[in-house]
Amino acid sequence: MPSATSIASFTRQFRVLVVGGSYGGLTAALTLLDLSRGRVARFNSTPDAQPPQRQLPIKITVVDERDGFYHLIGSPRALASENYASKTWTKFEDIPALRSPDIRFLRGSVNSVDCQSKVARILDAHTKETRKEKYDFLIASSGLRRVFPTVPKSLRRDEFVEEAKKHVGDIHNAQDGIVVIGGGAVGVEMATELRLLHPNRNVTLIHSRDRVLSAEPLPAEFQERVGSILREAGVKLIFGQRVLDITAIETEGERRLWKLELADGRTIYAGHVMNAVSKSVPTTSYLPEEALTEEGYVKIRPSTQFPKTLPNADSHFAVGDMVSWSGIKRCGAAMHMGYHAAVNSHQLMLSEDSNYKPEFINLQEVPPVMALSMGKTAVTYTPDSGTKDGEDVHDVMFGEDMGYSICWNYMRMSEPFQA
């Protein structure tokens, strides 16, 4: 129970704009809901942590192009299993932990942010009109712009369920096998999921380099082990080749056939092609250029705040895949950052009382780590433990649903909001 004094001592309501309702954004929002009500944040792992001594009047606005939380990690299975797909997308209004009068969700996209005036311009997906939204604190967590099949094309849950259904139908009709192009994390997981869920379909993975995961700063031992598990799963591997052209061939009935031309002159035919090659780019076009690196990532301080050179920098935070920070982009890192941004912004709110000095928590440098779900097994790498794999590793890292329950329960999203 809260052990905080009345909110009446604060003369105004704090307006927080969260851009992006995925792992980092929702973690930040949930943390602020806890702290503003005088509770220990649900993500606080500090032993004997004490709740804030004061409650705060707060209004959180979350802007997202989607109408709900989508479990991005589960994409390789969601696009191969209709039943699983329906589980991975939950509309924001159906999440018990977010049914609070202190938070609202707006489906749309942010076009621009004026750090000086603290005003964001938002394109409302429903009205198709641009509106101005004033804020006191901004937490940018809109991630990377990814393309299908890394993420679904749909922006609404009902559309996504139909999209997944059609995609699974294409797999069932792929009598001439399936080709996955790209040996990054998504391509690797997708190929093994297809073999697990559709064992009667031949699956071929084509990658332009000599090893899978060639773009990641990971040891050769890890990459080679992933390649071995792909082969053990029955995936045919073609390394060192680029696909130059893909052509649809006319067939009778529902059977579809695709012709793929490789750089070495070979021709391959498949009933279904999944292109998992794409360069994800940060969704930061709405932010000032001074806050971004040349690649478009947000430059942040260890507190997750914008660089000091920007106006009102202390009131602007960025978290997750869109920021320039060490380590491989992962949902765990995004949630970790979201917690930091929320705690530090809450400290600044408390500091409006002249007697309170804010105490920030800071990010530490993160080494490259990775965990891949490959059918019934998983492969992990950390600098301390090296490469590990096995069904027991899969159970710990992903459970039975590609980490959905682990993430959902960690955020405690089934627990009803308590006033």
PLM features: what roles do these ranges have?
Residues 3-106, 192-218:
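Beta1-alpha1 glycine-rich phosphate/pyrophosphate-binding loop at the start
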Residues 108, 328-333, 337-419:
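C-terminal, flexible cofactor-proximal segment of oxidoreductases
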Residues 2-19, 100-179, 276:
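FAD-binding core/adjacent interface of flavoenzyme oxidoreductases
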Residues 157-175, 267-336:
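FAD-site-proximal beta/loop scaffold in flavoenzymes
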Residues 22-25, 184-188, 342:
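Catalytic nucleophile loop
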Residues 101, 105-108, 112-113, 200-302, ...:
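A Rossmann-like FAD-binding core segment of flavoenzymes
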Residues 154-239, 246-247, 324, 336:
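Predominantly flavin-linked oxidoreductase catalytic cores and closely associated redox partners
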Residues 36-58, 251-259, 309-313, 353-357:
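Intrinsically disordered, low-complexity domain-flanking/linker segments in eukaryotic proteins
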